[in-house]
């Protein structure tokens, strides 16, 4: 089965099981940098995807230091959950209102992916995620409310479907620099050259 079919199957099964009805609730975009930057990087990734964690730890952090923190480049994280654990992670991530603090939580979610994503069941995984989230200003009530929020859940999955249709995403991470598509196999130096060429 192709990756594209697997992604579609996850959404189909989840919708069928939960009886989802789309809402008008909007998911806050996780982003850093000047919105008017000449270079905009969009990263479609799943929080449980090892390649996504590798990209975030080895490439994003260098891009942040060299280009994003100086407002040369705008970075956008677009959640593309491949499973329920990743979906719940996105829901918790969305509960952090401050953009920089949300990126800090995203950093730790990826840094500690092996610790939380390998839980024995979804309850154990949620508990592991909660321990991380508490260090970033969320309490138990807030976390539980976020996990139960069907409006946010619907919107995350809706945005994933729209991204699939618009960008034909077949694997994660998929990176777009000014709407040009790249996969996660590129190195930091590859992306650095691409950005510098645009600038």
Predicted feature residues:
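Extracytoplasmic thiol/disulfide redox context detector
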Residues: 2-83, 87, 134, 154-167, ...
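Cysteine-centric redox/oxidoreductase cores and disulfide-bonded domains
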Residues: 81-171, 176-189, 193-199
